[in-house]
Curated annotation (Swiss-Prot):
Keywords: Chloroplast, Membrane, NAD, NADP, Plastid, Plastoquinone, Quinone, Thylakoid, Translocase, Transmembrane, Transmembrane helix, Transport. The gene is ndhG. It is a multi-pass membrane protein. NDH is composed of at least 16 different subunits, 5 of which are encoded in the nucleus. GO terms for cellular component: chloroplast thylakoid membrane. This is NAD(P)H-quinone oxidoreductase subunit 6, chloroplastic. One of its GO terms (molecular function) is quinone binding.
Length: 176
């Protein structure tokens, strides 16, 4: 998507804010239904991050798979939970929670300082020009198809066999 610079930046800021607010909603909301819907917002924002970089197929695939299937499955599973059994032994704050939040906060601040102090100019311009021309000649779907049929053929087939085994196992468990 060829957007002007300020519009592109504003779009990324709004997607980032939606991602942060949705992530906070997943963690902080006590109702599991609201938390699952916040996870849906996070997954939508992640899939929409691919649109400004002209990866429409990846955005559509993530939107269909994660939001359309995984999040609906999570909401469906949360609906079957019995909420009363989880809220009986609820402690507001434990020592493990404090240690975990301290570790996560220190990792967050170290990542922020690393990103802030990194010179991104040299990283952006290291791509060779012939790679850019080769990528522009084919669409995203063609690039994915070429990569799956050549470089990633064996891993693709192994993943399909693993998924088939998981499906057969799920059917066998459902029959019992």
């Amino acid at each position: 998507m060829d957007l002007p610079g300020p519009i592109h930046d504003i779009l990324l800021v709004f997607l980032g804010l939606g991602l942060i607010l949705g992530g906070l909603g997943v963690v902080l909301l006590t109702n599991p239904i609201y938390s699952a819907f916040s996870l849906g917002l996070v997954l939508v924002c992640i899939s929409l991050f691919h649109i400004p970089s002209n990866s429409y197929f990846v955005a559509a695939a993530q939107l269909l798979i994660y939001v359309g299937a995984v999040n609906v499955l999570i909401v469906f599973a949360v609906m079957f939970m019995n909420g009363s059994e989880y809220s009986n032994d609820f402690h507001l704050w434990t020592v493990g929670d404090g240690v975990t939040s301290l570790v996560c906060t220190s990792i967050l601040f170290s990542l922020i300082t690393t990103i802030w102090n990194t010179s991104w100019y040299g990283i952006i311009w290291t791509t060779r020009s012939n790679q850019i021309i080769e990528q522009d000649l084919t669409s995203n779907v063609q690039q994915i198809g070429i990569r799956l049929a050549t470089d990633f053929y064996l891993p693709f087939e192994l993943i399909s066999i693993i998924l088939l085994a998981a499906l057969i196992g799920a059917i066998a468990m459902a029959r019992q």
